[in-house]
From Swiss-Prot:
The lineage of its organism: Eukaryota, Fungi, Dikarya, Ascomycota, Taphrinomycotina. Glycans are attached at residues 115, 198. It comes from the Eukaryota. Its EC number is 2.4.-.-. Keywords: Glycoprotein, Glycosyltransferase, Golgi apparatus, Membrane, Transferase, Transmembrane, Transmembrane helix. One of its GO terms (molecular function) is inositol phosphorylceramide mannosyltransferase activity. One of its GO terms (biological process) is mannosyl-inositol phosphorylceramide biosynthetic process. InterPro entries: Glycosyltransferase_domain (IPR051706), GlycoTrfase_DXD_sugar-bd_CS (IPR007577), Nucleotide-diphossugar_trans (IPR029044). This is Inositol phosphoceramide mannosyltransferase 1.
Length: 319
């Protein structure tokens, strides 16, 4: 009886493992299908006609406040970003109701201590300053609403048409995911509530600086949270496609090189991304070679066992 139970367990455990793996894979696919631009994201992706000056419905009210939040360590913005910052100020003047707020390290610490002291142990535990900047932007926009944008993003035209289209807007990135270098929201938006309350769960070191930053509080963290949010009943959210967010003629924005926090590991990941076809080809060859060697070892062992078994049978027949 015990032997039969052991056999059933030996057969059942792998089967259960496969079933659980399939269920986990389906759940992950169901969440991450929103990562890739396509049919899943079409219903809430903004088009050029959505943001044309003459497409606003009569009486359509702006949902998102006319406040632009930006972050830097102090009041002295580097010269390399002066053109982008000034372009946004020109397109969004005070007389049109726009307000600019530059959040320095000192202002961020004061704001966080005063309003979100419960998060400060996690905030102080981040090993890299960029993680603190990433987390702070979520809290600031959750608290005040408005538009967050990095200093290396310039403005080619006013963002006014975007403010009435949804309660939250996030740009998609190619080939997959969403960016956290620009996003817009109403105050106390439920998606940002979800994001800030999940930061502590993702506060881990993921080998090197680049994946740690991206997964703990950066774009991959926000992308995953956004995909999860889309699976639940939610307020109107919209995605800003590359057509309206990239460097093209119809875009609201221009982009210059930023990412001052990138290290050597980031350069490796970026190189892999830019040479993805070659990397996949050589990875396939390596996987095939490893599989071939493993099969060769297995067949050799089986052959040796077969020869040994034959010899033992012969010895039993002819002692």
């Amino acid at each position: 009886m015990g032997r039969k139970c052991r056999k059933l367990l030996l057969k059942g455990i792998p089967i259960c493992g496969v079933i659980l793996l399939i269920l986990w894979g389906y759940s992950l696919y169901n969440t991450l299908r929103f990562m890739v631009p396509g049919k899943a994201t079409e219903p809430f992706t903004l088009s050029l006609s959505d943001v044309s000056d003459d497409t606003s419905a009569p009486g359509e009210m702006e949902k998102i406040p006319r406040v632009i939040h930006q972050l830097w360590k102090d009041e002295n913005i580097p010269e390399r970003w002066s053109n982008t910052v000034n372009s946004c100020r020109r397109q969004h003047p005070d007389e049109n109701g726009w307000q600019f707020i530059l959040w320095t390290d000192e202002k961020i610490m004061s704001f966080m201590n005063e309003n979100y002291s419960w998060f400060m142990p996690v905030f102080h535990s981040y090993p890299y300053n960029i993680q603190k900047f990433d987390a702070a932007r979520y809290f600031i926009l959750y608290h005040y609403g408005g538009v967050y944008m990095d200093l290396d993003i310039g403005c080619k035209k006013p963002m006014d048409p975007l403010l009435s289209k949804a309660t939250f807007i996030l740009p998609s990135t190619e080939p997959i995911g969403y960016s956290n270098d620009w996003f817009a929201a109403t105050p106390k938006h439920p998606f940002l509530y979800q994001a800030i309350h999940n930061l502590s769960k993702f506060n881990h070191r993921y080998f090197t600086k680049y994946p740690t930053v991206f997964l703990s509080a950066g774009p991959l963290f926000l992308s995953y949270q956004f995909c999860k949010y889309l699976l639940t009943p939610h307020e109107p959210v919209r995605v800003l496609p590359a057509l309206l967010y990239g460097n093209g003629p119809n875009s609201f924005f221009s982009h210059v090189t930023g990412d001052s926090w990138h290290g050597t590991d980031a350069k490796v990941f970026i190189w892999i991304d830019r040479n993805s076809k070659s990397v996949l080809f050589f990875a396939f060859l390596a996987a095939f070679a490893i599989l071939f060697l493993c099969l060769r070892v297995v067949f050799k062992r089986r052959r040796k066992r077969g020869i040994a078994a034959s010899h033992s049978q012969i010895q039993e027949l002819y002692p």
